[in-house]
Amino acid sequence: IGLRFPADLSRCGIFGHSMGGHGALTLALRHPDLYRSVSAFAPICAPSLCPWGEKAFGGYLGEERSLWRGHDATALVEDGHRCPPILIDQGLDDSFLAVQLHPERFEQVCADGQPLTLRRHPGYDHSYFFIATFIADHIAHHARALTTA
């Protein structure tokens, strides 16, 4: 981006949805020097603990589960990684919530020093409508972090 656009690379934020939300969390936790803000919609918070994550990590990283920790947002926080305050929005009617997402586990490990705002929304699922409803809050979250000195 810095090569193509007149961007201030000292003021970057990252966000995503679902697995992209997990990517945003892990990148921010692994590279807090690169990102001043982070947010996610319905992220997979602990892929090492869910069927989809086990399949993906096993396929890409092998069966040695200790290697997965560096790519799992919950494990990164457990291992002491920190980043700027995180905003997560989660729909309570999300069909992936119970088995795949594990935001409660992420919230638990963040209680030990990682600033987190986890907002739970009844009546919302994993869809575009959910994101469209709350995207302005995420933009404001990033704007606050990126416009302060």
List the predicted regions and their residue ranges.
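Non-catalytic cap/lid and distal C-terminal segments of serine-dependent acyl enzymes
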Residues: 1-149
